[in-house]
């Protein structure tokens, strides 16, 4: 179990601390004396975790989506992609490590894979800019998609970002234009593309690599135009809580599936993807494989037409 506990997991954390204490006593003072009680407490902790995660509200799901121990892009690549060769740079300005990508084999299929990487510790978070991509990151994504077309390869995107980087230098280098061009390339791509929202799907920074034929989302991930805290500040001037904003925004996987913004929810292990990363990544791999196999049977014209209709339908539903 991950050492990082969320606020709503505190009762579970207290119970697991007691289990750890009894385990130490059992090993030192009286070997085997507490085995029965330890097993009982472990079963109770598992039941508590299962019940808690079955009844998460929108704000709790937001916290889970941001959990630092959820699988990251580099983890998905290590688990699902063989012979991965990273490609760097946008051939215009620099290499942005907030978006990583390259070529590899996914369950025997040659693919182009790309995604946001947030980093896990201070050094890697700074290296990857906490997943906030700059213009060159999106231009690198465009370059990767152009390679996919050249070699007739499907594209798999992993989305996990709070948004594009809003700094002055980023604006000076045209981040809005880069996001727009990347979104356009996703929509007009002549090969199949699938996006998986694995944690946070924030604003244009997310949709720039998620305007795809199929959009999948993990059970406790979120997808929105702005973070709940930002919406609360802008729309309600801080008069509401972030939790109230999250509920009003309809950002959960379940809300998004009902509104047909995402195509499929991928179930997470009890306790979230961070509690069993291997099982979570296996589930993602199975879902992506199924979607890619269906899309590979379609020609370029059909792929583009279906993609366009998918996003037109989202716009039409918002006007009703």
Curated annotation (Swiss-Prot):
Its main location: cytoplasm. Pathway: Lipid metabolism; malonyl-CoA biosynthesis; malonyl-CoA from acetyl-CoA: step 1/1. Its EC number is 2.1.3.15. Keywords: ATP-binding, Cytoplasm, Fatty acid biosynthesis, Fatty acid metabolism, Lipid biosynthesis, Lipid metabolism, Nucleotide-binding, Transferase. It catalyses: N(6)-carboxybiotinyl-L-lysyl-[protein] + acetyl-CoA = N(6)-biotinyl-L-lysyl-[protein] + malonyl-CoA. InterPro entries: Acetyl_CoA_COase_a_su (IPR001095), ClpP/crotonase-like_dom_sf (IPR029045), COA_CT_C (IPR011763). It is found in: Cytoplasm. Coiled coil: none annotated. Transmembrane segments: none annotated. GO terms for biological process: fatty acid biosynthetic process; malonyl-CoA biosynthetic process. Component of the acetyl coenzyme A carboxylase (ACC) complex. First, biotin carboxylase catalyzes the carboxylation of biotin on its carrier protein (BCCP) and then the CO(2) group is transferred by the carboxyltransferase to acetyl-CoA to form malonyl-CoA. This is Acetyl-coenzyme A carboxylase carboxyl transferase subunit alpha. It comes from Phenylobacterium zucineum (strain HLK1). The gene is accA.
């Amino acid at each position: 179990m991950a050492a990082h506990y969320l606020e709503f997991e505190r009762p579970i954390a207290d119970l697991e601390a007691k289990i750890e204490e009894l385990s130490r006593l059992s090993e030192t003072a009286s070997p085997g004396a507490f085995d029965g009680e330890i097993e009982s407490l472990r079963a109770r902790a598992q039941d508590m975790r299962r019940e808690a995660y079955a009844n998460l509200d929108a704000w709790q799901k937001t916290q889970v989506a941001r959990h630092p121990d959820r699988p990251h892009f580099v983890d998905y690549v290590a688990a699902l992609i063989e012979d991965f060769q990273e490609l760097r740079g946008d051939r215009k300005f620099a290499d942005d490590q907030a978006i990583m990508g390259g070529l590899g084999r996914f369950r025997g299929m040659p693919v182009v894979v790309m995604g946001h990487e947030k980093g896990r510790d201070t050094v890697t978070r700074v290296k990857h800019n906490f997943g906030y991509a700059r213009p060159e990151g999106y231009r690198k994504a465009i370059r990767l998609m152009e390679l996919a077309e050249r070699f007739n390869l499907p594209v798999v995107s992993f989305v996990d970002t709070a948004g594009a980087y809003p700094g002055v230098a980023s604006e000076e280098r045209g981040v809005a234009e880069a996001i727009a061009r990347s979104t356009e390339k996703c929509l007009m791509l002549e090969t199949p593309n699938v996006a998986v929202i694995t944690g946070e799907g924030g604003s244009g920074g997310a949709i720039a690599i998620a305007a795809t034929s199929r959009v999948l989302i993990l059970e406790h991930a979120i997808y929105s135009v702005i973070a709940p805290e930002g919406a609360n500040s802008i729309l309600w001037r801080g008069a509401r809580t972030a939790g109230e904003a999250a509920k009003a925004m309809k950002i959960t996987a379940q809300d998004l599936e009902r509104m047909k913004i995402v195509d499929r929810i991928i179930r997470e292990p009890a306790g979230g993807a961070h509690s069993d990363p291997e099982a979570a990544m296996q589930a993602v791999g199975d879902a992506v494989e199924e979607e890619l196999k269906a899309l590979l049977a379609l020609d370029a014209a059909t792929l583009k037409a279906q993609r366009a209709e998918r996003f037109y339908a989202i716009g039409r539903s918002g006007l009703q």
